[in-house]
Regions:
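Short, glycine-/small- and polar/acidic-enriched structural segments
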Residues: 11-130, 134-137, 141
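Short hairpin/turn module used for nucleic-acid contact or packing/dimerization
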Residues: 290-316
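Pocket-lining segment of extracytoplasmic ligand-binding domains
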Residues: 145-251
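Secondary-structure end/capping motifs
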Residues: 220, 226-300
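Extreme N-terminal starter segment of soluble prokaryotic enzymes
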Residues: 1-4
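Short helix-initiation/N-cap motifs at beta->coil->alpha
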Residues: 30-41, 94, 132-171, 309-316
Length: 316
């Protein structure tokens, strides 16, 4: 049976994309491309049989009862987001609590990176999110003609920025801070810096204290396909697990390293010391706490209006 799938091109997915690993019993035509485009194709047109998807947007769609997909416990993208918080150094922001009363920009209010970082700020650092004025817009280049913002209860404040770019507004001082996946072009100008200068240490500390390694994206499958082909989820999980095994094996090679990072093997040792031997786990058992934490973030931030059980999100 021929299926269409779309994934980001990562070390843990590359063996699927290039054909080294195949899905037993199914002919999957894998595609890759910009993740925002992949997500749009999935959520707006439901044109893909298997796809990588934003965890937050998948959760919101499922809670509303409008998602045609169900998830596998496979997480192609995970990321601590402490490093994604940029600030003006002249606004008296020395700690997370100092963000209260400030104007903070972000590309999208509902995406997983923003959800997780706000959840960490509130739950771990005690920041009152409703005391921040959130400004949603494009960061370094114009991407959209319409900026969507959610309807949130008072006193939450979320506004759309349709004229300027958030990076420019941070540089000129019209914003006090910015959540951005990648360093904005204004970094280093006019005192723009990261709130957490040694973010990797702060992220490791967060994991040691909470046991949560945030999930950004999840792999989902069309529900109707799972109903017709109950063996598909297991075949996919096995294939993704094998692709991940190949990626980890490549990281372990020291004789002729596969990556240009000079201390990649040391980074691997460090990751295992902090996160455990299987530092990028698949499966529900190893990820239950992280998933339930992020569902809680979404509920607390009013992105979903009801509790969502793991059984609604993931294949049995």
């Amino acid at each position: 049976m021929k299926l269409t799938g779309a994934l980001g091109d990562f070390d843990r997915t590359r063996a699927l994309l290039d054909g080294r690993v195949r899905v037993a019993g199914f002919d999957v035509e894998w595609q890759s491309g910009e993740l925002e485009s992949i997500f749009s194709r999935a959520l707006e047109g439901a044109e893909l049989d298997i796809t990588e998807l934003s965890f937050s947007n998948f959760l919101v769609a499922t809670a509303k009862g409008v998602c045609p997909y169900i998830a596998l416990p496979v997480f192609p993208t995970r990321c601590f987001r402490h490093h994604a918080l940029f600030i003006r150094g002249d606004r008296g922001i020395r700690a997370p609590a100092d963000l209260e009363g400030k104007r903070i920009g972000l590309r999208e209010y509902t995406n997983t990176a923003s959800l997780v970082l706000r959840g960490i700020l509130a739950g771990y650092y005690g920041v009152k999110l409703e005391r921040i004025r959130w400004v949603v817009g494009d960061v370094d280049r114009r991407e959209r003609t319409t900026i969507r913002i959610p309807e949130l209860p008072a006193p939450y404040q979320v506004v759309a920025e349709t004229k300027g770019l958030l990076s420019d507004l941070l540089e000129t001082g019209e914003l006090d801070g910015l959540i951005a996946y990648a360093p904005p072009r204004c970094l280093g100008r006019n005192g723009v810096t990261r709130l957490f200068e040694r973010w990797w240490e702060e992220e490791a500390r967060y994991f040691k204290d909470t046991g949560v390694f945030p999930i950004m994206h999840v792999v989902v499958v069309r529900r109707s396909l799972v109903e017709r082909h109950p063996g598909l989820p297991r075949a996919l999980l096995d294939a993704f697990s094998e692709a991940k095994r190949i990626a980890i094996r490549d990281l372990e090679i020291e004789s002729a390293p596969r990556t240009m990072l000079p201390w990649a093997s040391a980074n691997l040792i460090q990751a295992r010391e902090v996160l455990g031997e299987d530092f990028w786990p698949y499966g529900l058992a190893a990820n239950r706490k992280t998933i339930e934490t992020q569902i809680g973030f979404s509920r607390q931030q009013h992105l979903i209006s009801r509790d969502v059980a793991l059984e609604e999100l993931f294949v049995p």
